[in-house]
UniProtKB/Swiss-Prot annotation:
Keywords: Biomineralization, Phosphoprotein, Secreted. It is found in: Secreted. It comes from Macaca arctoides. GO terms for cellular component: extracellular region. The modification Phosphoserine is found at S2, S3. GO terms for molecular function: hydroxyapatite binding. Secreted by parotid and submandibular glands. InterPro entries: Statherin. Salivary protein that stabilizes saliva supersaturated with calcium salts by inhibiting the precipitation of calcium phosphate salts. It also modulates hydroxyapatite crystal formation on the tooth surface. Residues 18-42 are annotated as: Disordered. This is Statherin.
Amino acid sequence: DSSEEKFLRRLRRFDEGRYGPYQPFVPPPLYPQPYQPYQPQY
């Protein structure tokens, strides 16, 4: 299991808990996410 997969899974789980499962895993641009180690290029 790569660290990127863990990161994406953690972020997806975070989004489902906060916004609901319908929300894309990319956080909304209302506020920054400074704790992210990097910004995925999508």
